[in-house]
């Protein structure tokens, strides 16, 4: 029921003056306008909330409708004829002749993967079968590492560039000389000497796709999984030629074969045989270069070391004094280092240390400066970092010995 004028409570007394009544009415009008504006804002918020829930309802309804649809089956096109397409279902291997729309026929070819419904009609074409794990190994953006970031490995880096980079940038040079470019390079040496760093640097200097994986990722529990992943890996490389395939810790799948009858060892050997087949099988590898790295060269099977698979066997040793000095300068070029720091003396005092150890010393020296509330790294910080690195390595060595004789 609508209030009448008599029902409305006035904001003033009847005895009030005309001026007081006018001021009271103006004050009430201002209050009502504020309340009206607030209610309008709340209405807009409510409408926005309603639209959001309406969109969510439509999305859930669409998803619910999709979930109620019958699943599609996977099949492979065996042959295209005038009557349609001959397909073979995955799983039961049953073959069938089915109709194909003109739009799909234009893109299909023998070997294409398709999705079919209950009546075996081709609904859509699927991507080529390649293991998802192999696809995620591809690195689209080249690693942000340059040759100037590597110190003490000039000879090794030159050989790697001749094997990987030169055939991609100037293939005509090899044709003129009349030789085939080396197809693979194996980097071996102690941990932390820069094997992976060299592979990243070469990839960053070429326009090739860089595909990196660890050998341990190829070791799987079920029969045939590792070999299938190797095939898929090289198929991805062929699809993205030119390509550089980097296999780290290759000793995980290429160790010396034994007479062991366990299923795990047999699966590893099957994976290695597939790798050998891909490296020098009947199918040409095309413009694909392989870089592998290991710190257990003594464990590798002789079959994988012969020429034609890895044409370059490059040892990556600990850097010498000059190499360590260059590595010190590389890792400190962005640091605020005091003028009194003698990198030549530091290099001479850090014998038999790897490039990774030198980097750890530089980082730890910076931490010592921060601990003393300084922004400048001094010679004493590097010396203290070296002592700390020696102390940290001694318990680890003792633990390894105790585990060996436990």
Curated annotation (Swiss-Prot):
Specify whether Cytoplasm is a keyword of the entry.
yes
Enumerate the PROSITE patterns for this protein.
Answer: AAA
Q: Which Gene3D superfamilies match?
A: 1.10.8.60, Nucleic acid-binding proteins, P-loop containing nucleotide triphosphate hydrolases
List, in alphabetical order, the GO biological process terms annotated in this UniProt record.
proteasome-mediated ubiquitin-dependent protein catabolic process; protein unfolding
Q: Where is the composition biased (Acidic residues)?
A: 1-12
Q: Which residues form a coiled coil?
A: 12-70
* UniProt-annotated stretches for the region Docks into pockets in the proteasome alpha-ring to cause gate opening: 404-406
Positions bound to ATP: 192-197, 331
Q: Which UniProt keywords apply?
A: ATP-binding, Chaperone, Coiled coil, Cytoplasm, Nucleotide-binding, Proteasome
Location in the cell reads: Cytoplasm
UniProt-listed NCBIfam families: PRK03992.1, PrtsmActNtasePan1
Q: What is this protein called?
A: Proteasome-activating nucleotidase 1
Originating organism: Halobacterium salinarum (strain ATCC 700922 / JCM 11081 / NRC-1)
Its ancestry begins with: Archaea, Methanobacteriati, Methanobacteriota, Stenosarchaea group, Halobacteria
